[in-house]
């Protein structure tokens, strides 16, 4: 009979800075490195943690659009994806997505250890 294998999962809650993707990604990277050190294989971050969440309803359409990133060329997801590959960890994170048709979405992306990405769009 096969021995059961364990899988370590963790979730992170942190105080993001509104409109400050650089800061938020720096904090996220620190949590990812800590999780890797602790041999975590699945790590989830909050909804819209890259861009910030609570301030968005107060922004103008132009300000929200400026925060959005197309997923395929997203600098934020390029970093998260590279860390997922490096640490062989599934990392989930949220941001404002700009779709190919220009529409904006509250998206949650799972960056997989093999480099693939899977997206859920909140309506």
What are these regions (language model features)?
Residues 9, 26, 48-49:
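Alpha-helical structural elements
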Residues 13-31:
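N-terminal phosphate-binding loop and adjacent alpha-helix
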Residues 21, 33-113, 118-119:
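Cys-nucleophile CN-hydrolase/nitrilase-fold catalytic domain and related Cys-dependent amidase chemistry
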Residues 6-17, 107, 119-122:
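Active-site-proximal beta-strand elements of phosphoester/diester hydrolases
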Residues 1-5:
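Basic/polar N-terminal segments that are highly enriched at the extreme N-terminus
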């Amino acid at each position: 009979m096969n021995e059961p294998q364990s899988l370590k999962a963790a979730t992170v809650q942190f105080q993001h800075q509104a409109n400050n993707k650089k800061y938020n990604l720096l904090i996220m990277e620190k949590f990812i490195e800590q999780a890797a050190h602790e041999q975590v294989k699945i790590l989830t971050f909050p909804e819209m943690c890259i861009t910030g969440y609570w301030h968005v309803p107060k922004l103008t359409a132009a300000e929200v659009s400026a925060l959005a990133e197309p997923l395929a060329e997203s600098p934020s997801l390029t970093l998260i994806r590279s860390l997922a590959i490096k640490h062989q960890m599934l990392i989930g994170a949220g941001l404002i997505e700009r779709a190919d048709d220009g529409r904006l979405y509250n998206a949650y992306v799972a960056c997989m250890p093999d480099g693939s990405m899977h997206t859920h769009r909140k309506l």
